[in-house]
Amino acid sequence: CCEWWKWWWKRGGRDPVGRAFLPKDERCFVIEKNGVPVACYFLFIMEPHIVGWTTYLVSNPEYKEKDRREIIKTLVTSVEKEAEKIGIMQLFTICGNKQMTSIHESLDWMLIPVQNEGFKYLTNNFIKK
């Protein structure tokens, strides 16, 4: 996934998300077709386990088959099912483009347009090397 991020994120002039900002491995989901990784998606779980946040969906830029959308849709559905098994009652996500918005809408997500979204790194909490 890291190489995919480098490819996608360089288009926006940003560095990809660091591993420290991702959930534990058991909350990192990868979907493959015929042994070729197509996309990955991440699930953060809030305490108590009522709300989950799915994020950082990234796809293999070299996978250009026509079934790409359906494979990504299957990945989103699979993460929904895993969240449901854990007891999550609501999932939250932010769709960064038309394709992801369309996929989530087709899966009955309620999407609300957001004018601005933001984040801030609290760098005083970073380990200094």
Where does each model-flagged region fall?
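A conserved beta-strand-loop-helix scaffold within acyl/acetyltransferase catalytic domains
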Residues: W5-N34, V38-S59
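Solvent-exposed amphipathic alpha-helical surface segments
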Residues: G12-P16, E82, I86, K129
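Short loop segments at secondary-structure junctions
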Residues: N34-G35, E62, N125-I127
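Short, solvent-exposed polar/charged micro-motifs at secondary-structure junctions
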Residues: V38, S102-I103, T123-N125
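Short, ordered beta-strand-loop transition motifs
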Residues: E47, V114-N116
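Acyl-donor binding region in acyl/amide transferases
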Residues: G52-W109, V114
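C-terminal "cap" of GNAT-fold acetyltransferases
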Residues: N116-K129
